[in-house]
Amino acid sequence: MKPRVLGMILAGGQGSRLAPLTQKRSKPSVPFGSKYRIIDFAINNFMNSGVFSIYVLTQYKAQSLTEHIQRGWRFGTFLSDYFITLVPAQMYRYEELGAVWYRGTADAVYQNMHLIDNFDADYVAIFSGDHIYKMNVEHMLEKHIESRADVTIAAYPMPRSQAHQFGVMQVDAGWRVTEFLEKVPDPPGLPENPDLSLTSMGNYIFSRRALEELLHTSISGQEDGFDFGHNVIPRALADGYHVQAYDFHRNPIPGQSNPNLYWRDVGTIDAYYEANMDLISINPEFDIYNPSWPLRTSSEFSPPAKFVHESDGRKGQAFNSVMAGGVIISGATVRDSVLGRNIRAHSYALIESCVLFDDVEVGRHSHLNRAIVDKNVKIPPGTKIGVDHDHDRERGFTVTESGVVVVPKSYTF
């Protein structure tokens, strides 16, 4: 008999390091890759793996995410085990703390244990909703069952110099976790390669009994916060539970011959920008065109993209770029960029190495370079963005260490 698997996506993250993109939306609802939202990748991973019973746990500025899920991710009403349901924080009342919002990743699940009980799950897959990657969850579940683990953690080998931002595991020869350290300044390396650390991707598969026991035993005394990395996983190891690491690099994706190596946290503006730029190469490391692993999202019913004018010096053209429907390139040039829906670029404008969200208008003779422009921005003719960073800062734009300029949503020039 096929096991009952419940998917839970943690989508309440504030994403403060992604400001100003997260000033009016949560991190999982930030647009990505022309037509998607960041959360779409977690949902697609579940659906492409045959997990169709999904709760999305939301909290911070969830309106944009709520509208996206309700508009684009709906099943019919006749299949009770096929659902994608939003679960907002509801001020759970603790005896010691009173009514509180979600106080961390584990607390979000703890406050909704009744959903797991009502579904009668055998296994619970708890995944982060704010990373860019493909993952065959079914294969991870198979390994979880084969190893007879209580909890399996998706693991990503990463250079030690970068691993301090993540939870880090030490494992034995069979990849059973022997130690878990959450965001330590000097993370340990792998025995076979000291320059690499085994980091947690924030994705877990729990056997239901172990999840219920661990949440109830590890919450005691956690008044400031309650997280899987800080509290639950260390408690599981201390109490002798079988905690297994799952090698993400061995995760098979249908239709993909090369190893599955791509996973991005996109927790900063620079990381987010680079992940978008990863899509535009001839043979991108992260391929969104694999028909055996479709990436679905909300349909907007936009008309096709259009390129007009071809006289000398005034050609509507684009090179090495990705763009959604409704785009009109009217005598402008676009290079190495990712464009959202319903963008209008007027004659003689030059857009280079940019990420433009939906409903942006670029005036004549404007020049945009290494910029992220949020939704509903009308750029006047002759405007330069990303060319003079001092002037960009004077206008209140964010300029990152690498020189990426961010124009906030609905900015008025």
Swiss-Prot record:
Q: List the disulfide bonds.
A: none
Give the binding site residues for alpha-D-glucose 1-phosphate. Answer: Y102, G167, E182, K183, S200
Instruction: Set out the biological process GO terms recorded for this chain's protein.
Output: glycogen biosynthetic process
Coiled-coil stretches are none
Q: Which domain of life is it from?
A: Bacteria
**Which InterPro entries does its entry note?**
ADP-Glc_PPase, ADP_Glu_pyroP_CS, GlgC_bac, GlmU/GlgC-like_hexapep, NTP_transferase_dom, Nucleotide-diphossugar_trans, Trimer_LpxA-like_sf
Family, according to the entry, reads as follows: Belongs to the bacterial/plant glucose-1-phosphate adenylyltransferase family.
Q: How does it associate, per the subunit comment?
A: Homotetramer.
Q: What protein am I looking at?
A: Glucose-1-phosphate adenylyltransferase
- What species was this sequence derived from? Deinococcus deserti (strain DSM 17065 / CIP 109153 / LMG 22923 / VCD115)
Q: Which gene encodes it?
A: glgC
